[in-house]
Amino acid sequence: MASKSDKQVTVEVNNNNGRSRSRSRGRSQSRGRGRSFKITVNSKNRGRRQNGRNKLQSNQRVRNIVNKQLRKQGVTGPKPAICQRATATLGTIGSNTSGSTEIEACILLNPVLVKDATGSTQFGPVQALGAQYSMWKLKYLNVKLTSMVGSSAVNGTAVRISLNPTSTPSSTSWSGLGARKHLDVTVGKNAVFRLKPADLGGPRDGWWLTNTNDNASDTLGPSIEIHTLGKTMSSYLNQQFTGGLFLVELASEWCFTGYAANPNLVNLMKSTDKQVNVSFEGDNGTPLIMKVPDTSHFARTAVARSSLPTTLARAGQNTTSDTVWQVLNTAVSAAEIVTPPPFNWLIKGGWWFVKLIAGRSRAGMRSFYVYPSYQDALSNKPALCTGSVPGGMRVRAAIPTTLQFTQMNQPSLGHGEVTATLGRSIPTPGDTFKVVLTIGQPLAPNTLNNQTWVNKTTTAPQGQHVVKIAKDTSNYTTMQGFTPISNVTWYTEDFQPSEEPPPISGLQVLVDSRKKADVYAVQQYLNHPSNTKDQLTSIFLVKVTTSFQVNNHLSYFYRAAGTGTAVENFKIRGATSEQNISFSEGWYLMTNTATFNPPAPPGWIWKNVELDNNTPYIVDQGMMHLIMSPPVGTQLLFEMKTTVSGTRNVSHFDHDENPSPVWCDALDAADVWELPTETDTESEEDEDEDDEADRFDLHSSYGSEPEDDDENNRVTLLSTLINQGMTVERATMITKRAFPTCADKQKRSVHMDLLASGLSPGNVWSHACEEARTMGTNHMPNVSGDRGHAE
């Protein structure tokens, strides 16, 4: 109390938790109880009125004295040893795809858990300090939402950010979220959600424990949840918007005290698994189990980073790992996943905790026990079902969804020599994958046990469009074969499970110059049916992102009998039928087959020609599934690449006009070679020189030039091609184009320069050959300065 006469300020602190010492109990028996104490500050007036400045100083003096006395009595907890200000970028807030309440983010504020969902275990200063000190608290917290779209670009969605003080999943509606401390955000505008120490205080005089292996109510701290309501629509295209809405950042000052190094806490992992099939099962009195494919990113990460259990299970029970994972479902499918009662609300709420069940996977699935809270997971008390899934829903397939998962704890906190885990480490894939494709239902007009329709031409009927797989406007091919794929499984080259790679940058599927699908993997198969013809089949694994329909000239392959006992492989039916093809969102295997005159260059080849009626095709590796529609569920194995390097484009000429087309590098516009224009006055001597230039030995035919760095490469490639059964002439030609000699480089350089000067093609080639002969005679290639232009 404060008396008016002497200006004394008295502060009374009662720290006995509401209990007083009994009168009949001795003093010694009440030790350890809370105690009461008073702080009196003498702020007596000295006879004259204080001005505003003196009053401010007096009030500050009172506060300092009170705070000092409170600290002496231990009411405010330990003094911070170190404080760290930091801004953590946590990722993006996606759009709402269902129109109902969807959770987009759940941010746990324990410093060792504040990471972005990139799959990285890298840590910053906050995580490093969290692994060194035993207690933490927040001085303030600002959650910044930076808009990623304009205020008029999208509409139909409201965003609400709220504080969950217990960090426990709950069944909360949009109205329930409004009962929390929250902030409503308008899409297209930046916002900051500000929290004070009173909102963030821990149970130990404002402090929280850092080690996540301890009691959940003492370690996690509060959490920040971000929800959206209403389907996000594009204002310009009048269709659903699927991009990000906000970038989320945490700006705060973490304080730490009580040094206790737990270095393994910095290695906790957070990542995202897209398009993973999730299902739940359980029966009356049994734990709720979540199942995911063992080839999914989440399953492989959990197996690799889940530690062996430190306790044994009872008879008849499964053993679980000691590592706990928080799972956040950010996709619309949370409301569609069928869950046994009574924990339907937990799954629809969008986030829960799981622990891996030890043992080998069954039927290609990994199993996890589901827990409604982190404390239940630490205590190994899974959610128990009171019934099973209704009979009519048991046959429903697993729902593809997007999971964000966070490793919550690390049972071993020191630097162990070898971490005991339930599986092997995740291999780092390269650009080559073994891809297992599961055939889906045939796409109309294809049907089971019948021929497979393919697009025959490179043009569509009037007013329609073909499907193009393109790198740019000059390098593309037209889709011919189209096979629906129900499931794609990725493996590394040594057949270790791998996660899905990102789409190939620069490649896309176009219809009338509009992107409809992404290309994830490619492969080409080059075969040589004869010395005068090469067959090239390109396959593309694509994922349609926007449904579309095309009308094309369709035909099919058939077996054609030759004369006598000879049987040709198969031909394309000459007559075509105009039919519609409807592509819905999902995976497809698209193919294109072309024939051309050899030789074929190294690298990826772009060839866009229609299927020829009079050409017999061989059944190569990329066309086997185009004879008849494969049965549903059939699995095809391909080795595919996720990069397209050394792109080459074939000049489009008829076979009769030019038996040796020119290849041009499509990656560098400055190096594109053009085929010299043929004239009627070309002499027989010029033709002989052409043949001489194209058919040369490993060394230049114009003289003995000194060896260069590619000599060994030429010999190795030539020997390899001949050993594989190729003719010496063809092997030599391929070797020449792969590793040209200095004379050939000089000849080509002079050829290009003289063409640019305006000389006729015949004279240009004669001068180029003469320059190459001169270089071979002098043994001194002109590699700098003037290239020796002929006049």
Curated annotation (Swiss-Prot):
Q: Where is this region: Basic?
A: 1-71
User: Does the keyword Repeat feature in the UniProt annotation?
Assistant: no
Mind telling me which residue stretches traverse the membrane in this protein? Answer: none
Region feature P2 globular domain, mapped onto this chain: 425-648
Q: Name one GO biological process term.
A: clathrin-dependent endocytosis of virus by host cell
The UniProt keywords, alphabetically, are: Capsid protein, Clathrin-mediated endocytosis of virus by host, T=3 icosahedral capsid protein, Viral penetration into host cytoplasm, Virion, Virus endocytosis by host, Virus entry into host cell
Q: Where is the composition biased (Acidic residues)?
A: 677-694
Q: Where is the composition biased (Basic residues)?
A: 20-36
The segment annotated Disordered runs over: 1-55, 677-713
* Inner core: annotated span: 72-264
Report one GO cellular component: T=3 icosahedral viral capsid
Q: Which InterPro entries match?
A: Astro_capsid_N (IPR004337), Astro_capsid_p (IPR022027), Viral_coat (IPR029053)
Where is the site Cleavage?
314-315, 394-395, 424-425, 648-649, 657-658
Q: One matching Pfam family, short form?
A: Astro_capsid_p
The answer to keyword Iron applying to this record is no
Ranges for the region named Acidic are 649-791
Q: What highest taxon heads this organism's lineage?
A: Viruses
Q: Where is this region: Core attachment?
A: 395-424
> What protein family does this chain belong to?
Belongs to the astroviridae capsid polyprotein family.
Q: What is this protein called?
A: Capsid polyprotein VP90
| Organism this protein belongs to | Human astrovirus-7
